[in-house]
Design a protein with these regions (language model features):
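A contiguous, low-structure linker/loop signature
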Residues: 68-114
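Single conserved hydrophobic/aromatic residue that forms the stacking wall/gate
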Residues: 1-8, 12
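Post-HExxH zinc-binding segment in Zn-dependent metallohydrolases
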Residues: 290-330
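Contiguous, non-catalytic segments that form substrate-binding/exosite surfaces or channel walls
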Residues: 109-261
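C-terminal, non-catalytic "cap/extension" segments appended to globular domains
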Residues: 10, 26, 42, 46, ...
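Active-site recognition of the HExxH zinc-binding catalytic motif
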Residues: 263-280, 298-302
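Charged, amphipathic alpha-helical oligomerization/scaffolding segments
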Residues: 13-16, 20-23, 46-56, 60, ...
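Charged, amphipathic alpha-helical segments characteristic of ABC-type P-loop ATPases involved
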Residues: 24-86
Length: 507
């Protein structure tokens, strides 16, 4: 008599293959984290070979015939739990993404992007776009080729890429979304700049010692709910979050002479991390044990950074502690002056340091350029000029060098084309969640009482714990009772900045 039934044996085999795939993916993630943080400068070339080998193992684990047979057997199996069925669905989708790509090209791309991030970091530091351009051209070439392998029924290449980050939001959907933002926010931004009151923020820039910035960052991360027993904070060229599983989530920040840059980077990345730390124990280290989508992920990071972190109520119980850390810099700056300063609208060059009102225009610029790169074969060499022209057109500023222009983001070096729109979508998702939560709890009073945990627990219960069991549209519908509606985002920005800039009485 066999020890296991045939069905039980299939479950065991499927679990074994899935565990192997997730273990390899986790190892690659760990190498990528190390590459961006602690690895020595010369490590990149050889480490990229290791990542290439691991990516080949991952490719085999997901695409092998045995895995295919097991997944096909499970497709439509009514005895599977919700989580099991979701993992089968996720692995089938992963196979659809990977199987059309030849394994040697898949591994070569993994090696390329592992090297590309180091090349980008050096080029940014040296303000030298030409040093990065050939590598970027290769990354774009691979991504277009891969999208071509995966495209079905004449689907456009950029739509294939967009689907990787936010399913169901094609160029057609995003063109409509950004059209609403452009129509409503460009004239409102102009009104704020021309008619709004003056806000002083010079005290945010100056001599803020790094060790004190780190102390403040660690305090704020913990205050909003980042668990240092299950996470670490490090320094990198570009702040990011890495998730290994719900007992190991890592964030980074960077330090400049503008204290609010690091401060809000930490709260933003803590928002990402809180999402991953909140994934259910039954889901972590499985294919669905991660955020529902990049848009939903950004909704959480930007919810913590902006809706919570830039509100006056958030600072009421803790501002005196911040002043005590920086008595010379902030001792004579009262709470209202501080809150106004960290919300000041200043159309600038750097996306990660943009105010909420102009932020979506930074994303729009990247979206338009990505469409041109992927759909119109834009020459990479023309990127710095095009970037500068668009910044001048939309925000009235022009970068003086590539580091504050086209080289400022890490995403393209990683091959993450189609990611940027999720930032603006995330802001819009977050605003819709905010208006719903205001109806069911006294949001501001909770923040004034230092009860960020109540808000965090609500998000964990209704969003975080589910991982990828639901997509972003379903989450919004289940939580708010409505389909996605970008008008909440426009309303949030207009209400907030009309109040902040004294425009309420001006119509």
């Amino acid at each position: 008599t066999p020890l296991y039934s045939s069905a039980a044996s299939d479950v065991y085999k499927r679990q074994t293959y899935m565990d192997k795939a997730m273990a390899i993916k986790t190892a690659m993630t760990l190498f990528e984290w190390d590459n961006e943080t602690l690895a020595p400068r010369e490590a990149g070339e050889l480490t990229s070979k290791v990542i290439g080998v691991l990516s080949g193992e991952y490719f085999q684990a997901v695409t092998c015939d045995e895995m295919k047979k097991l997944l096909e057997k499970c497709r439509g199996d009514k005895s599977l739990t919700t989580a099991e069925a979701a993992n089968v669905r996720e692995l089938l989708e992963e196979r659809e993404q990977i199987c059309p790509i030849p394994q040697d090209e898949y591994q070569e791309f993994a090696r390329l992007t592992a090297r590309a991030t180091s090349v980008w970091a050096r080029a940014k530091k040296d303000q030298d776009f030409e040093a990065f351009a050939p590598t970027l051209e290769k990354v774009i070439g691979f991504q277009k080729k891969f999208a071509g392998y995966r495209a079905k029924d004449g689907k456009k290449l950029y739509d294939v890429m967009l689907d990787d980050y936010e399913k169901g939001f094609s160029m057609e959907n995003l063109d409509r979304f950004f059209s609403v933002l452009k129509k409503q926010l460009v004239p409102f931004l102009k009104k704020v700049m021309e008619e709004g009151k003056m806000i002083e923020d010079s005290f945010l820039k100056g001599d803020y010692p790094e060790e004190k910035q780190e102390e403040l960052g660690r305090f704020l991360a913990e205050y909003v709910g980042f668990d240092f027993d299950r996470g670490v904070m490090a320094v990198s060229a570009h702040p990011f979050t890495t998730n290994l599983h719900n007992k190991d989530v890592r964030i980074t920040t960077h330090y400049t002479d503008c204290v609010d840059s690091s401060l809000f980077s930490v709260i933003h990345e803590a928002g990402h991390a809180i999402y991953e730390l909140g994934i259910g124990d039954d889901l972590t280290l499985t294919p669905v044990g991660q955020g529902a989508s990049m848009g939903m992920h950004e909704s959480q990071s930007r919810f913590f950074e902006n809706i919570i972190g830039r509100s006056r109520s958030f600072w009421v119980p803790i501002y005196d502690r911040v002043q005590a850390m920086f008595p010379e810099q902030l001792g004579k700056v009262n709470l209202d002056q501080f809150v106004e300063a960290v919300n000041k609208v200043t159309p600038g060059l750097i996306r990660t340091e943009a105010d909420e009102l102009s932020y979506s225009l930074h994303v729009l610029i990247r979206y338009e350029i990505e469409k041109m790169l992927i759909e119109e074969d834009l020459d990479v060499e023309k990127l710095p000029r095009l970037w500068a022209d668009k910044y001048e057109e939309y925000l009235g500023v022009r970068p003086e060098n590539p580091a504050e222009g086209v080289l400022q983001d890490i995403h393209w070096s990683q091959g993450s084309f189609g990611y940027f729109p999720s930032y603006a979508l995330g802001s819009a998702f977050g605003a819709q969640l905010y208006y719903h939560m205001k109806e069911i709890m006294d949001f501001d009073s909770l923040l004034k009482d230092g009860r960020v945990d109540v808000i965090r627990d609500y998000l964990r219960e209704h969003i975080h714990q589910y991982g990828k069991l639901k997509d972003s549209r379903q989450i919004l519908k289940d939580v708010t009772g409505e389909d996605f509606n970008p008008e909440y985002y426009v309303r949030y920005l207009k209400e907030k900045y009309s109040r902040l800039y004294g425009l309420e009485s001006k119509g």
